[in-house]
């Protein structure tokens, strides 16, 4: 029940404040402050980028995809704090998000346009002898999509956390032995932490972007 601190700042306060930075703040005023304006711009740009290639049927997914990305960013960013656990490093959670959403896009395609959805399994202009082989390959690639979604998110975050842990341990061990090397290692650790923050946000965006691409094929 101890609240650890980082540079004198209680981490529990940072953990409680971070979601409010990401999620939009409702306001009835004509003019908002800079933070609310930045939040609105970020969410609008993200939604526009995702939904631009989709037709009107895919726009129904706007709230779901935007909420999912904010949810993943929140989990990834909070997991970078010391003494915290990152749920998105668990394959079970990522597969629990990837499989139902991927399956929903496939079911929508089969229900609305079954001919076009099944047509994706056989590229146009395929020679007749290769038709059975290509159908099997395309079917396997279709079922691998949710696994690739979940494994990509898990592997990227796990690798970053392991690197941070190893470099931090090396800096701590080298501090009494070789202070100069320890300081250089700490600088590398700081740069890697900045990179991991970027990776945490980019991987959430890539997860949702790939879902929107799967949706684009079936809507």
Curated annotation (Swiss-Prot):
It is found in: Mitochondrion inner membrane. PROSITE patterns: ATPASE_A. GO terms for biological process: proton motive force-driven ATP synthesis; proton transmembrane transport. Keywords: ATP synthesis, CF(0), Hydrogen ion transport, Ion transport, Membrane, Mitochondrion, Mitochondrion inner membrane, Transmembrane, Transmembrane helix, Transport. Its main location: mitochondrion. Changing residue 17 to A: In subspecies Rhodurus. It catalyses: H(+)(in) = H(+)(out). InterPro entries: ATP_synth_F0_asu, ATP_synth_F0_asu_AS, ATP_synth_F0_asu_bact/mt, F0_ATP_A_sf. The keyword Ion transport applies. GO terms for cellular component: mitochondrial inner membrane; proton-transporting ATP synthase complex. It comes from the Eukaryota. The chain crosses the membrane at residues 4-24, 61-81, 90-110, 124-144, 172-192, 194-214. It is a multi-pass membrane protein. GO terms for molecular function: proton channel activity; proton-transporting ATP synthase activity, rotational mechanism. Pfam families: ATP-synt_A. NCBIfam families: ATP_synt_6_or_A. Subunit a, of the mitochondrial membrane ATP synthase complex (F(1)F(0) ATP synthase or Complex V) that produces ATP from ADP in the presence of a proton gradient across the membrane which is generated by electron transport complexes of the respiratory chain. ATP synthase complex consist of a soluble F(1) head domain - the catalytic core - and a membrane F(1) domain - the membrane proton channel. These two domains are linked by a central stalk rotating inside the F(1) region and a stationary peripheral stalk. Component of the ATP synthase complex composed at least of ATP5F1A/subunit alpha, ATP5F1B/subunit beta, ATP5MC1/subunit c (homooctomer), MT-ATP6/subunit a, MT-ATP8/subunit 8, ATP5ME/subunit e, ATP5MF/subunit f, ATP5MG/subunit g, ATP5MK/subunit k, ATP5MJ/subunit j, ATP5F1C/subunit gamma, ATP5F1D/subunit delta, ATP5F1E/subunit epsilon, ATP5PF/subunit F6, ATP5PB/subunit b, ATP5PD/subunit d, ATP5PO/subunit OSCP. Belongs to the ATPase A chain family. This is ATP synthase F(0) complex subunit a. The lineage of its organism: Eukaryota, Metazoa, Chordata, Craniata, Vertebrata.
């Amino acid at each position: 029940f101890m609240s650890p601190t980082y540079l004198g700042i209680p981490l529990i306060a940072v953990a409680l404040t971070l979601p409010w930075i990401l999620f939009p703040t409702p306001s009835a005023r004509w003019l908002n402050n800079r933070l609310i304006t930045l939040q609105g711009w970020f969410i609008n740009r993200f939604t526009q980028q995702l939904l631009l290639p989709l037709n009107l049927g895919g726009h129904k997914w706007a709230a779901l995809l935007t909420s999912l990305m904010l949810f993943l960013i929140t989990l990834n960013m909070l997991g970078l704090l010391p003494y915290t656990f990152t749920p998105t490093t668990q394959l079970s959670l990522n597969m629990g998000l990837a499989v139902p959403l991927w399956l929903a896009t496939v079911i929508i395609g089969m229900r609305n346009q079954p001919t076009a959805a099944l047509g994706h399994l056989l590229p146009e202009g395929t020679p007749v002898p290769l038709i059975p082989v290509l159908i099997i390959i395309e079917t396997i690639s279709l079922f691998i999509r949710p696994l690739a979604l979940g494994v990509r998110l898990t592997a990227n975050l796990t690798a970053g956390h392991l690197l941070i842990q190893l470099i931090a341990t090396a800096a701590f061990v080298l501090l009494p032995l070789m202070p100069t090397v320890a300081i250089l290692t700490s600088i590398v650790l700081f740069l890697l932490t900045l990179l991991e923050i970027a990776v945490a946000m980019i991987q959430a965006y890539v997860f949702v972007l790939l879902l929107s691409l799967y949706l684009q094929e079936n809507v």
